[in-house]
Regions:
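N-terminal lobe of the biotin/lipoate ligase/transferase fold
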Residues: 1-106, 176-177
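Long, positively charged amphipathic alpha-helical accessory segments at protein N-termini or as interdomain linkers
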Residues: 2, 82-108, 118-200
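Active-site proximal loop and beta-alpha junction motif in alpha/beta enzyme cores
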Residues: 22-24, 112, 148
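Short beta-strand-initiation
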Residues: 44, 60, 111, 121-123
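A secondary-structure boundary/capping signal
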Residues: 51-52, 112, 145
Length: 200
C-alpha cells in the first residue's frame, strides 16, 4: 500500500514539519538522487525525501541497500552545508533507532559504525553522504535511512552477494505495522540528534 505521506506531520524543530516537509516520489533509483541535488540542498534543507519503491538504494562502501516496494522505509534528510556532520551524528541516530524499535518491544543493538541489528540480523542501515560543490567551503550533506518494516523475506534469499542475514519488524513481531506512524517516530527521535550535532 502506498505511503499516506500527506497525513504525516512530524512536529519537529530542525527537520521541517507540515504538508510541504516531505518530498515524495513513488519510485526512485535512490532518495539521494534528489537529496544531494545542489538546488534541493539550497532550497529544501530540512525536508525529507522518501520513496515507496527504491530501485538502487545506496549503502556503505558502494554496496546496494535492498528494500521491498511499499513495505519498507527508505528516505533521506536534506542537511544543507551549514554544518559539518560526521560519525557523531550517525552514533546519535543509531541510539535513536534502537529507542524507536524498543517502543515496539524489540531489543536491538548497534553494529558500529552505522547498522542496527536484532538477533544478529540487520534491520536498519544509516548513511551520511556528502557532495562537494565547486566554490563551496563545506560539502552538502544528506542523512539516509533504510529500515526493513513489513518485508517478509531475508535479503540473502534474493541477493547471493549479501554477507549478512536481515530481518524486519514484521518478521520479528509476526504482524504488519503502520509505516506512517513509524516514520513519524523515527523523525521525531532523530531531530534532536541533528539539533545537538548542528550546534557543536
Amino acid at each position: 500500500m502506498q505511503l499516506d505521506y500527506k497525513s504525516i506531520d512530524f512536529n519537529t524543530k530542525w527537520i521541517l514539519s507540515g504538508s510541504s516537509s516531505i518530498i515524495y516520489r513513488e519510485t526512485l533509483n535512490s532518495t539521494l538522487s534528489i537529496a544531494l541535488d545542489k538546488q534541493r540542498q539550497i532550497n529544501d534543507k530540512g525536508k525529507v525525501v522518501i520513496t515507496d519503491h527504491q530501485t538502487s538504494g545506496k549503502g556503505t562502501h558502494g554496496k546496494q541497500w535492498i528494500s521491498t516496494a511499499y513495505k519498507d522505509l527508505t528516505f533521506s534528510i536534506i542537511l544543507g552545508n551549514e554544518n559539518s556532520f560526521g560519525q557523531k551524528l550517525i552514533d546519535e541516530c543509531c541510539l535513536a533507532m534502537v529507542h524507536v524499535l524498543s517502543l515496539y518491544d524489540l531489543k536491538a543493538n548497534i553494529k558500529y559504525p552505522n547498522d542496527i541489528y536484532i538477533n544478529n540480523k540487520k534491520i536498519v542501515g544509516i548513511l551520511l553522504s556528502n557532495i562537494q560543490s565547486q566554490g563551496e567551503n563545506k560539502p552538502y550533506q544528506a542523512l539516509s535511512i533504510g529500515m526493513n518494516v513489513n518485508s517478509e523475506i531475508d535479503i540473502k534469499s534474493i541477493d547471493e552477494k549479501a554477507k549478512v542475514n536481515s530481518t524486519s519488524i514484521f518478521l520479528e513481531l509476526g504482524k504488519e505495522i503502520k509505516r506512517e506512524e513509524l516514520l513519524k517516530l523515527i523523525i521525531q527521535n532523530i531531530d534532536p540528534a541533528i539539533q545537538k550535532q548542528g550546534y557543536l
